[in-house]
Amino acid sequence: MRDQKSLVADPRMLTLARDSRGWTQSELADEMTRLDGSRITQGYVSRAEAGRIPVREGRVQLFADALRYTADTLCRATDTAGAGVGLVHHRKRASLGAPALRRIHATLALTRLQVDSLARAADLHRNDRFRRVEVNDFDTPADAAETMREEWKVPAGPIEDMVALLEDAGALVVVRDLCTTELDAVSQWPPGGHPLILLNSHAPADRSRFSLAHELGHLVMHGEPGEGRVQEDQANRFAAEFLMPHDAVLPELKPGIDVSRLLDLKARWGVSMAALIRRAMDLGVISEWHYRTLMVELSALGYRTAEPTTIRRETPRHLAQAVTRLEQQLHLSPTETAHLAGLGREEFHEIYLCASSPSGHKDVPDSSAR
């Protein structure tokens, strides 16, 4: 940790931190006023974020206390820290507004800084099995999915654990509250780095698996910006083939599908009933009319909102293992580990241990906790 006298906030990091909290400049100014006792204006926050006035020493700490990040985090240079670098992919609904999307992008950027700091400190080994796969008029998204399954030696049939598969290939997966139900996952693979996927903790388990496969499709197929709808369709087709390979799922769909049969297939393949119906249509097992009829039936039963048959929720392991190493082998306190990620202890625990803690990880007394 740097001496407070050397602290100078990076203007872009101030904006990124505020966006990640979903606050306006006025809301941040109000919180700083509440904490400090003296009036902080929206204009002051605006000038600080624009770099027109330097934010030093005690004022850095005030911003940090209000935004609930460490002061060191706000002083990181965004052009060297990796924040905001790389193409961002997300599986979202059209109704997701710009402020919510800005918050998610900021959360992704700051999460990358956090996980990179933890992985580096723990000397976390990560495989490097991701690569770009070209998709064109001859090589389809389904071909790309088949290629990745072959290269990663995925056994035939349903995938047992998508999170484990992605982590073993070199990605880091973080399950956290993205403060919306309009987006299930977001991902990024910056140059020279490893893929990172944020999975919305609000997403149902069956939808989460498809979202992870969807993000994998983006990561391997879409290294450059493209037409949004085209890339979304390609990622969906990749995900369908990756999770439900045509040669394995087709014989199970061909006898015909109804709601009862869909429940059985959902439990076996670990995808939603809606995804199975779409797969059946795309493979020519049912007509578009039959597809629409089944979707109307799901709606009438209330299954478009919440489907029956619970699927096991898959949990990340690699970052929790890194935290265990930092605390048990390198003897860092929980607060010191949290500060490595630029967070307070409670928020760090909620993000990196509650949703992804392997059994056996326990909190230990921390005399340094504030």
Spans of model-derived segments:
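Active-site hotspot residues in diverse enzymes, especially metal/ion-binding acidic/histidine motifs
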Residues: 1-370
